Amino acid sequence: MGPKHFLNFEKISNQEFVSIIERGIELKNSNETEKTLKGKILGLVFEQPSTRTRVSFEVGINNLGGSSIFLSGSELQLSRGEPISDTAKVLSSMLDVIVLRTDNHEKLEIFSQNSSVPVINGLTNLFHPCQIMADLMTFREVTEGKNLEKVCWIGDGNNVCNSYIEAAKLLNFELSIFCPKGYEPNANILESSKKFVSLATNKEDALRLSLIHI
């Protein structure tokens, strides 16, 4: 059995999702952080720039007793034509977990298929699941554990929006998307969760919902 990756919400259960969020809140509120990742090394492979995602992963691994190595796109042999499959094999032979941030989701899939350690999606053109985990953890904190019922997304149908669509299906909440024509979310992702998602083109429908994420 190979490593368990976190590329999107397709292969994670509702129970796993909730337990991760609850564990995150528990660690956040703990005065003494458990050093459960002592001796582990996290590789941050970022072809795209980042502030919040990079810092949060670096702080997290350090708080849990591990360490991190950061590699930008210009520091990798990928820029010289090395296959991403080879990069994945080499890096995973020396690291314990890898966060990949790239502009192409297919790259992430190829990388994970050739990695011997878990791979986490730090952002692709198609999904940004870690952002949704952070958003919904915050919601759970401020509502003291209340289940999410309705979300309204206002803006272009980008990678974060696509991840919200997957989350709606996973957590069984209603997602209304207010998106200008020509900026709709990925059609295949939308179709897979159509029972939980509606796409609006007028602001009146969007404003009737209870939670707005811009």
How should each PLM-predicted stretch be described?
Residues 1-55:
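Positively charged, low-complexity intrinsically disordered leader regions
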Residues 95, 209-210:
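An anion/phosphate-binding loop that grips the pyrophosphate of nucleotide cofactors and donors
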